[in-house]
Each structure stands twice: as structure tokens, then as C-alpha cells.
């Protein structure tokens, strides 16, 4: 059994000696060979030229050392602010001071063209520009342009909802004028119903009686504005009193009058004779002085 295991280990040993660790390069391979391997390591569906960076220009060559120096002096400064300051300093340099950096940029460009002869600069699209193009105004119904367009369309053709509420082409003022013109006729009906009230009621005050007398005595037709205001005190009173209730009202009035008339043994005939005078005092808004 041990002999079989030793035989298997001997057969499996030589292939391991031929393999190399991933961190070490095989013998005879240089830097150029490693560079070739990195170029072919891209996935098959991706263009290897997309991973290649542009050659640095003169400003990038100069700012490479200046940026590091400024970042060490101002650790809390943002990178965008550093770029602004470096750009302002680069513009202040003279052509003589820029010359060595320009020559270095030309050399780097020549090396780049030699290493990547098929390279073409392809600027990447900005994500913000794509978002604006992918979201046109038509996708949002509440945009300002769509609201203006819908308002113009409703102004030309009219809206069925607004027409149903009386705000169409004619406007809502026509209905209001018609309602205002219909108020005088309703006031006539109130005047006729006011004539059916009994002559005196125990809960009637001088203000309501005065308003009824002014309505019934006015011969001319009131204006629409006055007709909209005056029917309000009449809306709180009943529209009419049946004839069989008049006797009850008169009996209650006699009982109330008999409390103030001296001599409680007077007959009903004397109360009836005193009733018209007291009724006149109540209608006039004055209190009878017979009990004094």
C-alpha cells in the first residue's frame, strides 16, 4: 500500500516543478513581455484602447509636483480648489518657465504614439447630459410647458368640467345675474305671506313688525341688491299661520293682558273692550299705562 502511494507521488511531482508562482515571472521574460500580458488581459468584448489614458500635457506635467506640494501644505483644501489655484498660477508663468514642461509633454506624447499607434481619444459622455436627454418634457405631465399648452387648449375649446359648473365661455356671472333678477319675485311672495300673519303675536318685537310694515307699504319694486339683503329677517319666521291657530294665539294674548289689567273680577266683555286698545299699544311698540 505504501509503495503504491510513493509511486503516485513520484508521478505527480514533475508537473509541479514546471509550474511557476503567480508573483514571479518565468525565466527569460522581461518588462516588455509583462506589458504585453497586461494588454491582452482585457475581456474579449471590451476594447483595450478604452483603458489607455491620454498623454499628459504641459500643465499636467507641471501640476503633478505642485499639486502634491499644495496638498501637503493645505490638507483640508478640496481638490477642486487646488486645481483652481494651480490653473491661476500656471497662467502667470512666462513662456521661458513653461518651456521645459512643454518639451516633456512632447516627449511623452511621442512615446504614447509609439506604444499605442491605434489609439484615438474618445471623450466619455457626461451622465448629467444623458439624464437631461433621456427625460424630455413630454414624460412629465405637470411640467410648465405642458401646463401652458393645456391652459391654451382649454381657453380655445373650453373644458367640460368648468362648463358644468357655469364657468364656461359665458362665465359664471350670467348665472349670478339671473339669480339676482329672480329675487324681486320671491320678495313679492314674502309680502303676500306677510299679510297672512295675525294682527298681534306674543313673540313679535317692534323691529320685525316695522320691517313687515315697510315691506307691505312700499309701492315701488325694490332693487336687486336690496332684495338680496331684506328677505333675511323673514326667513326665520313661519311662512303662514293656519286659521285654526289664530284662536289659540288670541286666547294666549288675552291671558297675558289680564295679568296687567287691575281688577281681576272683570268680565270677559270688558276684556274684549280693552283688547283693541292694548293691541294698538303692542303694535306701536309702547306699553299700556292702565295698571299704574
Curated annotation (Swiss-Prot):
It is found in: Nucleus. Residues 1-10 have a biased composition (Basic and acidic residues). GO terms for cellular component: nucleus; transcription regulator complex. Residues 52-120 bind DNA. It comes from the Eukaryota. GO terms for molecular function: DNA-binding transcription activator activity, RNA polymerase II-specific; RNA polymerase II cis-regulatory region sequence-specific DNA binding. Its main location: nucleus. Residues 209-229 have a biased composition (Low complexity). One of its GO terms (biological process) is dorsal/ventral axis specification. Residues 1-35, 209-248 are annotated as: Disordered. The modification Phosphoserine is found at residue 159. Keywords: Activator, Developmental protein, DNA-binding, Nucleus, Phosphoprotein, Transcription, Transcription regulation. Pfam families: HMG_box, SOXp. Transcriptional activator. This is Transcription factor Sox-19b. The lineage of its organism: Eukaryota, Metazoa, Chordata, Craniata, Vertebrata. The gene is sox19b.
Amino acid at each position: 500500500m505504501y509503495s503504491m502511494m510513493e509511486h503516485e507521488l513520484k508521478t505527480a511531482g514533475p508537473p509541479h516543478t514546471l509550474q511557476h508562482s503567480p508573483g514571479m515571472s518565468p525565466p527569460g521574460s522581461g518588462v516588455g513581455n509583462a506589458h504585453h500580458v497586461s494588454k491582452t488581459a482585457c475581456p474579449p468584448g471590451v476594447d483595450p484602447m478604452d483603458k489607455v489614458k491620454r498623454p499628459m500635457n504641459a500643465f499636467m506635467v507641471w501640476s503633478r509636483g505642485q499639486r502634491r506640494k499644495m496638498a501637503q501644505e493645505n490638507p483640508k483644501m478640496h481638490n477642486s480648489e487646488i486645481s483652481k489655484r494651480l490653473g491661476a498660477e500656471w497662467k502667470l508663468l512666462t513662456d521661458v518657465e513653461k518651456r521645459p514642461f512643454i518639451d516633456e509633454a512632447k516627449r511623452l506624447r511621442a512615446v504614447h504614439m509609439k506604444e499605442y499607434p491605434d489609439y484615438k481619444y474618445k471623450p466619455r459622455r457626461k451622465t448629467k447630459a444623458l439624464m437631461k436627454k433621456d427625460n424630455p418634457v413630454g414624460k412629465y405631465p405637470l411640467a410648465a410647458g405642458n401646463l401652458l399648452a393645456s391652459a391654451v387648449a382649454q381657453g380655445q375649446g373650453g373644458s367640460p368640467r368648468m362648463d358644468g359648473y357655469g364657468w364656461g365661455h359665458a362665465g359664471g356671472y350670467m348665472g349670478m345675474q339671473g339669480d339676482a333678477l329672480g329675487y324681486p319675485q320671491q320678495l313679492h311672495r314674502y309680502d303676500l305671506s306677510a299679510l297672512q300673519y295675525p294682527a298681534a303675536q306674543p313673540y313679535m318685537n317692534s323691529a320685525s313688525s316695522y320691517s313687515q310694515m315697510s315691506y307691505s307699504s312700499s309701492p315701488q319694486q325694490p332693487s336687486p341688491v336690496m332684495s338680496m339683503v331684506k328677505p333675511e329677517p323673514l326667513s326665520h319666521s313661519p311662512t303662514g299661520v293656519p286659521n285654526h291657530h289664530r284662536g289659540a294665539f288670541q286666547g294666549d294674548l288675552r291671558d297675558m293682558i289680564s295679568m296687567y289689567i287691575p281688577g281681576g273680577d272683570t268680565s270677559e266683555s270688558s276684556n274684549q273692550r280693552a283688547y283693541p286698545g292694548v293691541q294698538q299699544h303692542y303694535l306701536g311698540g309702547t306699553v299700556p299705562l292702565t295698571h299704574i
